C-alpha cells in the first residue's frame, strides 16, 4: 500500500504493524452536517476497510468539538442549552453516518471532557512565555 505523506510531499510505501491508529477531526455539532463532512469520513472508512482486508486492526479516533463559539452562538439564537443542541446534532450526524454504512469510530472524545487538560496546557504555555493574553483570549 502507498499513501501520500504530506510532510514529505510524496507518495510513499505504507508498511504498518498489526495495529493502525488514525485520527480525524470531527464535527462541531451546531447544525446539520453536509456532504463535505461525509466525504472526509468516507475516506477514512475506505482506508480502514482496506487495512482490515489486509489483516490489520484499526482504531480511528474522531473528536467532537462540543463547545465552540459557533455552537454557543447558535444555542443562544435558538434559546437552548448548548449541550442539548450538541446532543441533537450528534444524534443526527450518527444517523447520517449509519445511513451511509460507515464504520463507527473507535473513540469519540469530546472537547468538554478535556477542559481541565486544556486549561493546564494554556497555563503551561503562558508560564513558559510561549503564549500571550489579549482581549480575554490566549494566543500561541
Which residues are covered by each model-predicted region?
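NTP-dependent nucleotidyl-transfer catalytic core
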Residues: 1-140
